[in-house]
């Protein structure tokens, strides 16, 4: 791939300029919220946030022009007609999202209190803008046409999320509280796209024009960025704390133990987070082989912390 490497070296020296008509992006947000103190001590909250972008920023190649031809698979053919460059400009479309959340809280006389929550998010954007430089922002996304300006599911859109917090306080030692806290969460998977291989996109579909860094970023079908959903992730954390007498009057002590991802502590197959590798393009062969997602080590491990708090 000598020619491809030479093209990559050229990309490093590409100029980046600002569209003379560039407008500063902005967002409009509208939020609604309410709290209902329901009978029997239940407290119910609900919130809705609607966001609409304006003058959304997008990077494009400033040197490309369509030849008017397309490949057999329908990919447009480009040629570079100027010095290689990127331009930061405004999208013809805008980012948008809707987020709804609700929760219910109840405290019982037995020493138990609980909070259950649910959140739904539907977020769409033109470009996830994941990076600090123009070239990376250009290639670290999925597209059918690298110059396209379309709104699709966002990398950051997690459709469903459930949360539960349970606290139970009792006294195994007279006058000193023992407190158990269980935090549990379950959320739907991360979005990803079905793409060509890195070689298939950079060379097969676009013949190095533009250079696409051999990322798995060229969609098999148009309009399908992030239309796939990864595996759900469910985990729980446990904290147990015990009040203790201080060394002198007025001092307080508390011993605690925290098990992060107690689900994985109980079973190696539980509490495991799997998601596609960045930038979230997956080939059909990877899907067929069952390797579309990778295990995320840090989030999937269990951890135990113990300590003592002493106040004086």
Regions of interest found by a model, annotated:
Residues 13-18, 81-89, 144-150, 218-225, ...:
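Extracytoplasmic loops and strand-loop junctions of Gram-negative outer membrane beta-barrel proteins
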Residues 45-190:
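Gram-negative outer-membrane beta-barrel transporters
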């Amino acid at each position: 791939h000598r020619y491809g490497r030479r093209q990559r070296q050229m990309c490093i020296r590409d100029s980046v300029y600002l569209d003379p008509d560039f407008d500063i992006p902005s967002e409009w947000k509208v939020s609604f919220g309410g709290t209902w103190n329901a009978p029997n001590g239940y407290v119910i909250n609900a919130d809705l946030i609607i966001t609409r972008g304006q003058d959304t920023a997008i990077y494009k190649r400033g040197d490309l022009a369509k030849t008017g031809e397309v490949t057999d698979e329908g990919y447009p053919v480009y040629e570079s007609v100027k010095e290689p460059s990127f331009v930061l400009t405004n999208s013809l479309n805008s980012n948008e999202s809707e987020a709804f959340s609700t929760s219910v809280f109840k405290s019982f006389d037995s020493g138990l209190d609980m909070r259950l929550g649910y959140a739904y998010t539907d977020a769409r954007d033109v470009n996830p803008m994941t990076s600090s430089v123009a070239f990376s922002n250009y290639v670290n996304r999925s597209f059918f046409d690298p110059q396209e300006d379309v709104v699709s599911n966002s990398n950051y859109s997690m459709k469903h999320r459930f949360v539960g917090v349970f606290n139970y306080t009792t006294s195994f030692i007279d006058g000193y509280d023992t407190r158990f806290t269980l935090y549990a969460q379950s959320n739907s998977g991360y979005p990803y796209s079905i793409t060509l291989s890195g070689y298939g996109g950079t060379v097969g579909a676009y013949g190095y024009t533009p250079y696409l860094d051999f990322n798995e970023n060229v969609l098999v079908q148009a309009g399908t960025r992030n239309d796939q959903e990864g595996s759900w992730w469910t985990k729980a954390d446990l904290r147990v704390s015990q009040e203790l007498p201080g060394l002198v009057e007025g001092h307080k002590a508390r011993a605690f133990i925290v098990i992060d991802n107690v689900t994985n502590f109980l079973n190696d197959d539980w509490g495991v987070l799997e998601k596609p590798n960045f930038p979230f393009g997956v080939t059909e062969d990877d899907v067929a082989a069952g390797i579309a997602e990778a295990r995320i080590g840090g989030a999937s491990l269990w951890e135990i912390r113990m300590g003592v708090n002493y106040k004086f």
